[in-house]
Amino acid sequence: NFPLLRLVVLFSLCSGAVLALAEGNLRQSELALFGLLLNNLAKGDIVIGDSGFGSYVVVALLRGLGVDFLGRTTRSTDGRRRTKRLGKDDWLMTWKKPARPSRWLALAQWAGLPAELTVRVVRGQVTCKGFRVRQVTVVTTLLDPALYPAKEVLQAYLRRWRLEMCLDDLKTTLKMDMLRNRSPELVRQELS
């Protein structure tokens, strides 16, 4: 019976450095922990996240801070619902605000979110040496295809994935993939 810890980490994609982290138990969602990290972001930043963070609420909160998002999503990105085609496998679509508020978000924050968001959907193949070619679909608030070509958007997402693999390697090398302490205080000490 091992204690379990949930961590959400904000990394710099340029350096790989940990900028901030939020910790919690398994009853706390990753989205709620991510909400604790929002004050570490600045206008002009770009958050690259996995599908758990590609939600209307996260993207709307980030846009409210002047922060852009790039990542996968669990929402439908059906090309038939696109509002404007930007190129092959590249289009804009509108996300409507969900009918129900997110459980982890305060009602005042929910009320302040816009009724809809425009996001860009880019679909394509990404390759990483040693791995099979993958077809991915990402959403982003980087809407201008001239400034952010589709191929570069996909490559940026791939860099996030490589950083995640490096984190897994680091945990194994430092023998931190399985923490030995049982109390939260000792686990924090072991991590630092």
What are these regions (language model features)?
Residues F2-S192:
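Single, function-defining residue in the core of a domain
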